[in-house]
Design a protein with these regions (language model features):
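Juxtamembrane extramembrane loops of integral membrane proteins
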Residues: 22-192, 199
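Ser/Thr/Pro- and often Gln-rich low-complexity regulatory segments
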Residues: 4, 23-24, 185, 206-214
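Short solvent-exposed strand-capping/beta-turn motif centered on an Asx-Ser/Thr pair
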Residues: 244-248
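N-terminal positive-inside, membrane-proximal cytosolic segments immediately preceding the first
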Residues: 1-13, 17-19
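Charged, alpha-helix-enriched surfaces in structured cytosolic catalytic cores
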Residues: 9, 186, 190, 236
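Coiled-coil termination/hinge junctions
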Residues: 200-243
Length: 249
């Protein structure tokens, strides 16, 4: 539903509809995207905690996969925070250094996004595209299932919006040139939401590789459990023999 709303507003922007209603709509979509990303981040954190717990129990089996999970989170958090800083710079460019990210004042500002993202001194949009593509490639390597890998790669999309061959603009200019501040911020938040989705898919794939959440055993061991820790001379020794199921990998 969120992505559908986003596409509708993007289509309206393509028709140069920058009415206050449309820009306010972008704010609503942006808020929903932020909430969705926060929910996904919490879910991803729990998955990594499960990997960490499994690693404590069986570091030989899980250790390598847990390290991959930590790396997934590290790369995801770094890119998420990089985009967050870009959003703050755009908002402050439009609303001033004391801008409130939850209460955008100059939503219709057409210069802020271009000045930050398309500066001739160093295009942040070009840097962002490279980082998104590098992240997409790194996360794809973490996923074994071909279908899920394809979904993951589609989630981080850096193709130029519009039909192939009909749009002569670059990805950078298509997304940020003369784009109202509210729209640019929403676009960046969408990528943050996509990052949390991709992070979740990568972590889930890693968790499946080590059967996190399953209790699997491959060995039965007999153990003697004495009824008393103290045995007096001449008294009978009593103990129970129990069978324990363990994972010896």
């Amino acid at each position: 539903m969120i992505n559908l709303m986003y596409l509708v507003f993007i289509a309206m922007m393509a028709m140069n509809d920058t009415s206050s209603e449309v820009l306010s709509g972008f704010e609503l979509v942006e808020k929903s995207l932020r909430e969705s990303a926060a929910t996904a981040a919490d879910r991803n954190r729990k998955t990594l905690e499960e990997l960490e717990a499994a690693n404590r129990v069986n570091p030989t089996k899980v250790g390598e996969w847990y390290k991959k999970g930590v790396e997934v989170k590290k790369q995801s958090d770094e890119l998420f925070e990089y985009i967050q800083q870009l959003k703050l710079r755009i908002i402050r460019q439009a609303d001033g250094k004391d801008a409130n990210v939850d209460q955008l004042q100059h939503k219709e500002d057409l210069d802020a996004a271009s000045e930050i993202m398309l500066s001739p001194m160093g295009s942040e949009a070009a840097k962002l595209k490279k980082r998104l593509e590098a992240y997409r490639a790194a996360m794809s390597r973490m996923v074994d299932d071909p279908e899920k890998r394809a979904m993951l790669e589609r989630a981080i999309d850096t193709k130029v919006p519009g039909k192939s061959g009909l749009n002569l603009r670059s990805w950078e200019t298509a997304l940020f040139e003369n784009m109202p501040m509210a729209s640019a911020v929403t676009i960046l938040t969408k990528y943050q939401n996509d990052i949390r989705y991709v992070e979740g898919e990568a972590l889930a794939s890693i968790a499946r590789s080590v059967d996190v959440g399953d209790y699997r055993v491959n060995k039965i061991v007999a153990q003697v459990v004495p009824k008393s820790q103290i045995v007096m001379s001449g008294t009978p020794y009593e103990a129970a023999i129990v069978l324990s199921a363990i994972d010896s990998t």
